[in-house]
């Protein structure tokens, strides 16, 4: 998923729509670089269509985020995995897998969030990209509709932030 990130300002030489899809390209590169595995691979389809990038309830592209969260959870639930490795997109692609695992293993799920940013923004904060709200969503905090979709949540005392360089 790429809609959770608002990164076009980082690439002023690219047309806005092309820059916005940067996370999708990164996901494709990760897929090429990742070692092949005998484990099942499941891909969540992601639309590359760019419509009007609208902010709703404090989240840019909120409708796409809700749609893709549902699609990811549907794929996860169809396969009922015991473990999940997620490659691609921006930080919020981790929300469905982490919350699924939190529901499956309620007493044995912890998150080590390795990122330059804590991703603990909330809807209504100045920055409206959902990728900056990913960890709070895993904690069960944030947009009510999105949080209701999520099968579980991880307790804040079972969360470790690693690699922070800025507190955004």
Each predicted region: which residue ranges?
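Conserved alpha-helical scaffold segments that buttress catalytic/binding sites
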Residues: 1-168
């Amino acid at each position: 998923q790429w809609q959770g990130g608002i990164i076009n300002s980082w690439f002023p030489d690219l047309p806005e729509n092309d820059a916005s899809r940067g996370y999708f390209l990164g996901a494709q590169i990760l897929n090429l670089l990742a070692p092949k595995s005998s484990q099942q691979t499941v891909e969540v389809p992601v639309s590359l269509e760019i419509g009007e990038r609208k902010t709703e309830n404090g989240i840019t592209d909120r409708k796409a985020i809700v749609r893709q969260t549902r699609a990811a959870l549907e794929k996860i639930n169809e396969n009922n995995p015991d473990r999940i490795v997620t490659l691609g997109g921006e930080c919020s692609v981790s929300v469905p897998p982490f919350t699924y695992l939190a529901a499956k293993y309620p007493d044995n799920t912890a998150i080590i969030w390795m990122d330059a940013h804590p991703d603990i923004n909330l809807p209504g904060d100045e920055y409206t990209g959902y990728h900056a709200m990913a960890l709070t969503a895993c904690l069960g905090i944030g947009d009510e509709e999105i949080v209701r979709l999520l099968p579980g949540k991880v307790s804040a005392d079972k969360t470790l932030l690693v690699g922070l360089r800025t507190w955004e």
